[in-house]
Amino acid sequence: MNIALIAHDRKKELMVQFCMAYCGILAKHNLCATGTTGKLVAEATGLRIEKYLPGMQGGEQQISARVSYNEIDLVLFFRDPMSSSEYEPDVHLLARLCDMHNIPIATNVATAEMLILGLDRGDLDWRNIVNPKAR
């Protein structure tokens, strides 16, 4: 499966900790991330991550483009609900695209944990039919 990782600045450390905790599961999949998030997670975990531009330079839009082509199977987007509204258009676009293509998205660690454990159980195997290239 293709998994996208995105985290607002104040949530990057939480994303790193989450990926360290679930490194064994994440290592079985193809990972991509916005630039800074990907760099931090890769350095902390040793996971192989395709890195896009930093979020504020278009990385979220690059991931959104892959979502629009149904090339991403799961999005983990740890967003900061207290951040300024400058991020909101990107967040809404990505969420809308995930809804359009039935791509699971977690915007907090509680939901991310449920999705990652479901992924490990095989609950998301139906995505292999939708996106056979992600195997």
Give names to the regions the model predicted.
Residues 110-135:
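Short, glycine-/small-residue-rich phosphate/pyrophosphate-handling segment
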Residues 28-37:
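Short internal beta-strands
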Residues 95-115:
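Short, acidic/small-residue loops that bind anionic groups at enzyme active sites
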Residues 1-27:
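N-terminal phosphate-binding or glycine-rich loops at protein starts, especially the Walker A/P-loop
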Residues 30, 47-58, 126-129:
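Short hydrophobic/aromatic-enriched beta-strand-loop microsegments
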Residues 60-100:
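Mid-chain, well-packed structural core segment of small domains
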